[in-house]
Amino acid sequence: MRLLFLLLTLTLLSCASDMKVKNFENETPKFVLEDYFDGKTKAWGMFHDRFGNLKRSFKVDITGTLDNDTLTLDEKFIYNDGEKESRIWSIKILGDNKYSGTADDVIGKATGISSGNALN
């Protein structure tokens, strides 16, 4: 019984391990946020509930403008129910592959770091 408990505990702990962006440092192509989003980008996505049921989908047109150490992302969303939404991100390029971003309708500050072909 103790062995079963130990195995279950180790299994659960392995699920909680952090993904380390550094593990991707040798992967290519190298992802550079400001290069990728400078200009026009189209994206799409969807929201699911916890049971996997599709709740909403969207398309987004993104215009990225780079000015010195700031990348501005102007996002225009169109949802499948016809709703439209806009968001403007101001992303500071901090150096050493680190970023910090804010948007008026988002509480707090987003932070990120890239390594190789990954961004976390």
Q: Language-model features: where?
A:
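C-terminal motif of bacterial Sec signal peptides marking the signal peptidase cleavage site
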Residues: 12-14
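Sec-dependent signal peptide recognition
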Residues: 1-8
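Bacterial signal peptide processing site
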Residues: 16-18
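Intrinsically disordered/low-complexity terminal segments and short unstructured peptides
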Residues: 8-10, 40
